[in-house]
Design a protein with these regions (language model features):
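Canonical Radical SAM [4Fe-4S] cluster-binding loop centered on the CxxxCxxC motif
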Residues: 16-49
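Flexible loop residues that form catalytic
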Residues: 39, 73, 124
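Short, charged low-complexity linear segments at domain edges
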Residues: 1-17
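A secondary-structure boundary/capping signal
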Residues: 23, 71-72, 161
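Conserved AdoMet/S-adenosylmethionine-binding subsite of the radical SAM
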Residues: 55-67, 76-191
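Conserved phosphate-binding and hydrolysis motifs of nucleotide-dependent enzymes
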Residues: 31, 72-73
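Short, flexible loop segments at the rims of nucleotide/cofactor-binding pockets, characterized by
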Residues: 44-47, 73-74, 96-97
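Conserved alpha-helical substructure of the radical SAM core
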Residues: 37-68
Length: 191
């Protein structure tokens, strides 16, 4: 597992949990406002943290820490993510996953295997402005919509969040995000 950061204690990253946060490298988006740009653009240039170091710390903190947040970059791009999450689960920690939602198949598999307990998914912009906000010339927006549907029917707690950026987001943009969300959620509910 490619780990490029480890915050040993956080009160912010996993709602209602004292948690540790693991940062993965790499991302399939190029958001111009990314707050972890170095993990996205140059993961190999960032210090590495071994999986063993993380797991050893988590084992020592059992009974003190209440969960683990896995973030990035984009964790769902990591080929060893599933195995890593299984090892955390063996330590009996609940896991929160932060994701951009562009890998719905991975999200589905992790949910089916009960490897994640909470998901925070970014909604970058309205449907029409998504590619620009994600820093991609072209993208398949249906993958975002599929992930929203997967989370809605997952039975686990989740949140959708938007990083507000001047020049990308306006009041009108947020109204469009709201309209799109309502339409999509109504379609998913069969209404």
């Amino acid at each position: 597992m490619e780990i490029h950061g480890f915050n040993k204690t956080t009160l912010l990253d996993y709602p209602e949990h004292i948690a540790a946060t693991v940062f993965t490298g790499g991302c399939n988006f190029r958001c111009p406002f990314c707050h972890n740009g170095e993990l996205v653009l140059d993961p190999a240039g960032q210090p590495s943290v071994s999986e063993e170091e993380v797991l050893s710390y988590l084992k020592k903190r059992q009974g003190i820490l209440q969960g683990v947040c896995v973030t990035g970059g984009e964790p769902t791009l990591q080929r060893d993510l599933r195995k890593f999450l299984q090892k955390i689960k063996e330590l009996e920690y609940p896991i929160k996953l932060d994701t951009n939602g562009y890998m719905p198949g991975v999200l589905w598999e992790l949910l089916q295997e009960h490897l994640i307990d909470y998901v925070a998914m970014d909604i970058k912009a309205s449907r029409d402005n998504y590619a620009r906000a994600a820093g991609l010339p072209h993208m398949d927006i249906s993958r975002i919509e599929e992930s929203i549907g997967i989370l809605k029917s997952s039975g686990i707690p989740y949140e959708f969040r938007t990083t507000v950026v001047k020049g990308i987001h306006t009041v009108g943009e947020f109204k469009e995000i709201g309209r799109w969300s309502c339409i999509l959620l109504a379609e998913l509910s069969g209404e």
